[in-house]
């Protein structure tokens, strides 16, 4: 008794195809973009965050070393764009807690409450790391979980900065300085 399994399979296939078309479902297969075990000589890497950068490439945060890498799947390379303990313009890079993309930049928030901006200079992965001045950033709680930016002016690359500060129970908004060097006012 019952319905023939072949008939059920045929009806299911027709229904799935119709539902996939209706809900814009696409079947995909995963691909390996980069093998960090080969690149680092087998050292353990702990990917704790990944964002799509302004150049469309993935940027990952290694929770073990604190390094941030730009991964280029076309040439099979991962270029380190940030590492803790580097002295730059009178400040030292700390262990990154958050990476995010904003406008033309990758933003890196470190454990010392510093906000760093890495901006790509070319398609080969060269770029510039600069510490951003953010008014009252030292008062942010240790529990900052989200930082993001939304474009103010696409042509200049300026963006408003938003910071979710759970301990203050606030979402903080900062307007960019006209020269793009930081966020002097909330």
Region roles according to the model:
Residues 75, 119-126, 174-184:
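Short loop/turn segments immediately following beta-strands, especially the blade-tip
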Residues 66-68, 114-116, 169-171:
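Structural signal for beta-propeller blades
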Residues 13-43:
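Alpha-helical linker/edge segments of TPR/alpha-solenoid repeat scaffolds
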Residues 63, 111-112, 120, 166-167, ...:
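Short loop/turn segments immediately following the C-termini of beta-strands
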Residues 46-54, 95-102, 145-157:
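Structural signature of eukaryotic scaffold interfaces centered on beta-propeller domains
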Residues 51, 57-60, 105-108, 116, ...:
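Conserved beta-propeller blade signature
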Residues 1-7, 51-53, 59-72:
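Amphipathic, non-membrane alpha-helical rod segments
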Residues 30-41, 77-90, 127-140, 184-186:
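A short beta-strand motif characteristic of beta-propeller blades
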């Amino acid at each position: 008794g019952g319905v023939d399994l072949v008939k059920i399979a045929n009806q299911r296939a027709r229904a799935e195809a119709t539902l996939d078309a209706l809900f814009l479902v696409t079947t995909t297969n995963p691909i390996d973009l980069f093998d960090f075990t080969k690149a680092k000589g087998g050292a353990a890497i702990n990917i704790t965050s990944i964002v799509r950068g302004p150049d469309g490439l993935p940027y990952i945060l290694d929770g073990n070393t604190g390094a941030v890498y730009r991964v280029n799947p076309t040439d099979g390379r991962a270029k380190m764009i940030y590492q803790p303990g580097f002295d730059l313009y009178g400040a030292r890079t700390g262990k990154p807690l958050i990476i995010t993309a904003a406008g033309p930049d990758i933003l890196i928030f470190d454990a010392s409450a510093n906000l760093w901006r890495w901006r790509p200079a070319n398609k080969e992965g060269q770029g510039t790391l600069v510490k951003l001045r953010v008014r009252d950033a030292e008062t942010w709680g240790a529990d900052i979980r989200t930082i993001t930016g939304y474009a103010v002016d696409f042509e200049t690359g300026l963006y408003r900065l938003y910071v979710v500060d759970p301990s203050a129970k606030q979402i903080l908004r900062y307007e960019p300085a006209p020269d793009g060097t930081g966020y002097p006012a909330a």
